[in-house]
């Protein structure tokens, strides 16, 4: 796992969306860049936003549970089918998967220095995922 990779499973959905951290009060990504927004004072010396940690030390604990939609022990940011319904997250989010491998775009997968899938075959992704029934749960998580 690369802690600097904004999309660990390359499905076109930012890890902060898949993890559930944006449901915490005061934690936002208003510019949709996959990085939690806030003034420097909102982050502790360990780099974590103060609203998601229990202290500012290197061994801080998260104060929220990372989302595991299908309760299989693998957190959503690391799964291509978070809800285990047989349909990959990239498609449920409303994005394109030209070769049906669960990864945004076609092979070879090209990522930039932030871990975002890039290249000529990328035509969408990294926007707000679909919630077609408007129940505030993204389709890839239900």
Task: Enumerate the language-model features and the residues they cover.
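Extracellular calcium-associated, cysteine-rich motifs in secreted modular proteins
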Residues: 1-142
């Amino acid at each position: 796992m690369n802690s600097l990779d904004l999309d660990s499973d390359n499905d076109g959905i930012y890890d902060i969306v898949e993890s559930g951290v944006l449901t915490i009060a005061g934690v936002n990504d208003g510019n949709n860049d996959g990085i939690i927004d806030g003034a420097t004072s909102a982050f502790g010396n360990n780099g974590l936003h103060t609203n998601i940690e229990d202290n500012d030390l290197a061994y801080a604990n998260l104060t929220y549970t990372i989302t595991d939609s299908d309760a299989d022990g693998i957190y959503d940011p690391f799964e291509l089918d978070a809800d285990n319904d047989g349909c990959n997250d990239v498609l449920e989010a409303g994005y394109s998967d030209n070769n049906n491998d669960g990864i945004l775009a076609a092979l070879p997968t090209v990522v930039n220095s932030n871990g975002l899938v890039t290249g000529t075959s990328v035509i969408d992704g990294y926007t707000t995922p679909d919630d077609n029934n408007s129940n505030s749960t993204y389709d890839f998580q239900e």
